[in-house]
Amino acid sequence: MKAYPLEACGLISGPTIGSEADVVDEFHPCVNMAGSARVYTIDPKDHLRIEREVENRDNEVIGVVHSHTHSEPFPSPTDVGQAPDPNWHYIIVSLKRESPETRCYRIIDGDIAEETLQILN
């Protein structure tokens, strides 16, 4: 990830939200306003721009992707506290080891549930 050693972040978009099998059409890299290796903050300007772009294609933002540079791919207390939408998918890429590890979660009212993540291409 280009942002390393800082946390990288971005939004994902697709045609549906809230179904059992949401499909991600696009990854939208964002600036990490926190400039940190431990936390991320998506630039509100990036978020608004991406929301408008995907709505023009009848898609919507369906989640966020970010890296954990020094920890496992599991939501931190900060991640849980920042989770803005219970319908979103939260994809975390751990860079703790030589080979990155990616996992996906839903975060609803502070409860964390892992989801199956299938990468097609």
Where would I find each of the regions flagged by the language model?
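Short, well-ordered beta-to-alpha junction loops that form the rim of enzyme active sites
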Residues: 67
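Conserved beta-strand-loop surface patch within small alpha/beta domains used
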Residues: 1-61, 70-121
